[in-house]
Amino acid sequence: MKLLISLIAMTALSMSVHAAETAAPTTPAPAPPLKPVRFILVGDSTMANTSGYGDAFCARVNRANTCINLAKGGRSSGSFRAEGRWDEVQGLLRGAAAYRATYVLIQFGHNDQPGKPGRSTDLKTEFPVNMARYAQEVKALGGVPVLVTPLTRRSFTDKVLENNLQPWADVIRATAAAQKAPLLDLNAESYAAVQAMGEDEADTLAMAPRPDKVAEAAAASGKVEVAGAAKSAFDRTHLGAKGAAYFSHMVMDEVKREIPDIAGQFKPESEQ
């Protein structure tokens, strides 16, 4: 009798084990949604809204609310901080828990050049320090600094494009290397593109149509940028809608190339 009971118990146990082995596997819990990537743009009028490529760049990002354009016309690497504008960037970085990563694109140079009282910075002793400090502070707050060399101006002499921003671009290249930060060499790429298209085509990228007295107009409106939004007039520094679209696409392509991990953060070409 005891033997029979033991056999019955063993059979029941075997059937239970077999049933457990053949039962449908449990469905794993769904993975939490991936946090978005955020972009913050810091710079001067060539990046700012209405006069630069920044808003057009943000429009190419998958989620418009994850791209914040804080660039401001007339600002240099020194005055942007002196006015307290960098405080806003740091505040955003401190509140970055909702984002997988925050990339801060930093572009200065135009207003760091000599002849702009209250904004010009010394190329050797101030500008490199300012750019390095921006990069270091972004990293300290958990962000990713992306240094951008200044957008070229579009003034030609005897069919050759001038590049008086080259020294500032060189400093940014060196700073990016020293800080191990991604570099978008917009100066080199925009210079090559504008030189290739020539003066007439380059002038179509401006904020307003080229007037008959082009030399006087360009000199009057583009030589010294006041500390504010650029006026809607022809010059060879600022950008209209066509110029913003053109150079924002260039910057987007540079981001995809230099930071391939976030190449998927932009809309398909057909939707841009």
Give the residues covered by each predicted segment.
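Sec/Tat signal peptide C-region and signal peptidase I cleavage site
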Residues: 15-19
